[in-house]
Every structure is written in structure tokens, then in C-alpha cells.
């Protein structure tokens, strides 16, 4: 049977011949995917499409209530910073992306993880360095030894919530590889387009103080971000509360989803 990788959960799949080109239910995560074999996708340019989650019609009051629920859940992990957390959730609801400009160690990664876990989304972290290649972010075609055909292996950009740490340390070529994903919600590789699952959100960070060995983000890249935020250092009372919370177990390990990606 043809083998593929489910980019929802990253687990390998064995697809029956009868299911090729049809909607296939992943036995690991239970999500529907359309998985044509790699050689067919290359030859006939068949687009691998992820079925969108069901959309419900929410009223403004229901959306506000849901937002407050997510914010309260995130703040079980993040101490203080209510304005920044509120803006981050607003950016999520607006299908935008966020750029955090701040020094290391102020819970940027923790905030991203807390939001992802609060809404039941997949989460990946990309650590940017000057030698990071676009293929390390998007994915690449790898020869399958069992079939002798190239098979596309999805990169971390295919998660629903992606933290791009120190984005300005990546080369301009690698930064540009994220433009299509952030602007169009899809990734093109070898003339084949792969649509990203919604919600899709990029949270990127950069250190505004340390500029050595960095590449300034171009205007086209900056335009992809809806919000530009800074968390800042906690005060003494917040530091005390943080220490009290992690006495037994870090709250990020126990946070539960209060909503789903739909």
C-alpha cells in the first residue's frame, strides 16, 4: 500500500489503493485528508488539500465570551500581561500573525504554547539560524526506498500554530519562504500547492537589542504581521506569583483545551 505522512499529526500512513485520491480518515488523529501518491501529484500537479474544519456562525457576544474563556485559560500559565494576551487572541480571531520584539526569557514561547493548547491546535517551534534553509521550514521531497519515488515530507510550517524564534537570524531566502504561507495560507513546492490547515498563525520573535549576525526584515515581510507586541519583564509581584505556580508542576504541562480549532 502507498505510504504517506499525515501533516496533522506527523504519523506515517498506509493508504489502501481504493482510497487514493479520495478523502482518507487518518487512524491516528481522526482528521480527513486528501492524499494522492507523490508521483501522481508531481506528474499531474494534483493539489493536496486539507478539508477545512466545520464553521459555525457565532454572534458577537458568543465570540467575546469565547475570547474571554481563552484569555482566562492562557493566564493560568502567563502571569499578568493581560493587554498583550488579549491582543494576541484578537490577532488569532482576525487570522493575523504576530511579531514579538523583546529580549529573551519573557515567556514568548510559553504564550504561543498556551494559546495553541487552549484551542487544541498543533504547535511547532522553528529556531532560526543563518544556515537554516527553506527546506528545513517548508519540507522537502525525499526518496522513499520502498517505492523508489520521491515523497514530500512536511516541515514544521505545516503546524497550525508556528513559533518562529529569532526570525531575523534566518537568511532573506528563508524568510521569503514563509511569505506565501503567511499571506495565502498555502505552500508551493515543485509546482505543487499544499494548503495549510486553519487556523494558521505565525508568532515570530526578534531581539531588538542584539543586531549582530541578523538580517533586517524587509517591508514585505513586516506587512504580513497584523500585530507587533512586546511582553516586557515581570514586576516583583508577578515574579513571586510565577515562583508559587511552579512549585509542584509547570502549568503549561496541565493546561487543558477550552475550545477547538473550529
Regions from the PLM with identified roles:
Residues 144-149, 170-174, 182-259:
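Canonical AAA+ ATPase core
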Residues 93-129:
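Walker A/P-loop
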Residues 87-90, 143-163:
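Conserved alpha-helical scaffold flanking the Walker A/P-loop in AAA+ ATPase domains
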Residues 61-98, 103-106:
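Pre-Walker A (pre-P-loop) alpha-helix and adjacent loop at the N terminus of AAA/AAA+ ATPase modules
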Residues 1-47:
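Cys/His-rich metal-coordination motifs, chiefly Zn-binding "fingers/knuckles"
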Residues 132-148:
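Conserved NTP-binding/hydrolysis module of P-loop NTPases
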Residues 165-166, 177:
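Walker B catalytic acidic pair
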Residues 86, 93-95, 106, 119, ...:
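Short loop/turn elements that form and flank the Walker-type P-loop nucleotide-binding site
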Amino acid at each position: 500500500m502507498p505510504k504517506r505522512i499525515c501533516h496533522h499529526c506527523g504519523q506515517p500512513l498506509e493508504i489502501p489503493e481504493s482510497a487514493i485520491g479520495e478523502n482518507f480518515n487518518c487512524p491516528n488523529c481522526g482528521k480527513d485528508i486528501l492524499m494522492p501518491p507523490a508521483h501522481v501529484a508531481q506528474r499531474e500537479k494534483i493539489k493536496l488539500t486539507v478539508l477545512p474544519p466545520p464553521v459555525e456562525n457565532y454572534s458577537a457576544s458568543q465570540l467575546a465570551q469565547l475570547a474571554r474563556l481563552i484569555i482566562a485559560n492562557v493566564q493560568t500559565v502567563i502571569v499578568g500581561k493581560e493587554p498583550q494576551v488579549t491582543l494576541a487572541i484578537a490577532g488569532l480571531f482576525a487570522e493575523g500573525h504576530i511579531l514579538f520584539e523583546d529580549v529573551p526569557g519573557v515567556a514568548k514561547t510559553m504564550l504561543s504554547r498556551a494559546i495553541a493548547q487552549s484551542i487544541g491546535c498543533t504547535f511547532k517551534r522553528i529556531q532560526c539560524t543563518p544556515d537554516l534553509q527553506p527546506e528545513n521550514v517548508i519540507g522537502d521531497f525525499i526518496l522513499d526506498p520502498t517505492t523508489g519515488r520521491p515523497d514530500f515530507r512536511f516541515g514544521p510550517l505545516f503546524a497550525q500554530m508556528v513559533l518562529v524564534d529569532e526570525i531575523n537570524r534566518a537568511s532573506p531566502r528563508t524568510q521569503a519562504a514563509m511569505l506565501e504561507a503567511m499571506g495565502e495560507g498555502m505552500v508551493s513546492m515543485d509546482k505543487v500547492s499544499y494548503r495549510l490547515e486553519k487556523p494558521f498563525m505565525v508568532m515570530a520573535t526578534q531581539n531588538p537589542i542584539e543586531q549582530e549576525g541578523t538580517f533586517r526584515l524587509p517591508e514585505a515581510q513586516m506587512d504580513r504581521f497584523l500585530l507587533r507586541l512586546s511582553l516586557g519583564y515581570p514586576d516583583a509581584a508577578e515574579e513571586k506569583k510565577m515562583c508559587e505556580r511552579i512549585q509542584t508542576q509547570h502549568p503549561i504541562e496541565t493546561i487543558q483545551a477550552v475550545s477547538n480549532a473550529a
